């Protein structure tokens, strides 16, 4: 099992798919990295030799990935919350940001339903 950028990459998968296990690398960027490192896209990770792994590590080091990318994203969200813009307020209150309706759906953002007492029983 190869270890690139602190992530154990599955050895039985093709190189392109295996590199997508790294946070911040999608399929297109994985293809780009393999081309820079001059490694075949169809080659499985278990067939990579040490020179190829080293070349891939060098190519990956130019990108913001894993912890560095996660911290940047969280700092961006924190900045939005601090300046008090619309998106920041929606982040703070745990609601959808991009104009979706919230009357019926958005259960993922709002969490589990909170039941309200029955109005008929409450008035008696």
Curated annotation (Swiss-Prot):
One of its GO terms (cellular component) is small ribosomal subunit. Signal peptide: none annotated. Keywords: Ribonucleoprotein, Ribosomal protein, RNA-binding, rRNA-binding, tRNA-binding. Pfam families: Ribosomal_S13. The keyword DNA-binding does not apply. It comes from the Bacteria. InterPro entries: Rbsml_uS13_C, Ribosomal_uS13, Ribosomal_uS13-like_H2TH, Ribosomal_uS13_bac-type, Ribosomal_uS13_CS. GO terms for molecular function: rRNA binding; structural constituent of ribosome; tRNA binding. Residues 100-124 have a biased composition (Basic residues). GO terms for biological process: translation. Residues 94-124 are annotated as: Disordered. Belongs to the universal ribosomal protein uS13 family. Part of the 30S ribosomal subunit. Forms a loose heterodimer with protein S19. Forms two bridges to the 50S subunit in the 70S ribosome. PANTHER family: 30S RIBOSOMAL PROTEIN S13/40S RIBOSOMAL PROTEIN S18, SMALL RIBOSOMAL SUBUNIT PROTEIN US13M. Located at the top of the head of the 30S subunit, it contacts several helices of the 16S rRNA. In the 70S ribosome it contacts the 23S rRNA (bridge B1a) and protein L5 of the 50S subunit (bridge B1b), connecting the 2 subunits; these bridges are implicated in subunit movement. Contacts the tRNAs in the A and P-sites. This is Small ribosomal subunit protein uS13.
């Amino acid at each position: 099992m190869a270890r690139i950028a602190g992530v154990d990459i599955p050895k039985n998968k093709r190189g392109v798919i295996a590199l997508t296990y790294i946070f911040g690398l999608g399929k297109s960027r994985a293809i780009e990295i393999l081309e820079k490192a001059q490694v075949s896209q169809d080659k499985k990770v278990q067939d990579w030799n040490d020179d190829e792994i080293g070349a891939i590590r060098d190519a990956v080091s130019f990108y913001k990935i894993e912890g560095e990318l996660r911290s940047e994203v969280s700092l961006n969200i924190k900045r939005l919350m601090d300046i008090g813009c619309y998106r920041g307020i929606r982040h703070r209150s745990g609601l959808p940001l991009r104009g979706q309706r919230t009357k019926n759906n958005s259960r993922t953002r709002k969490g589990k339903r909170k039941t309200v007492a029955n109005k008929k029983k409450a008035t008696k």
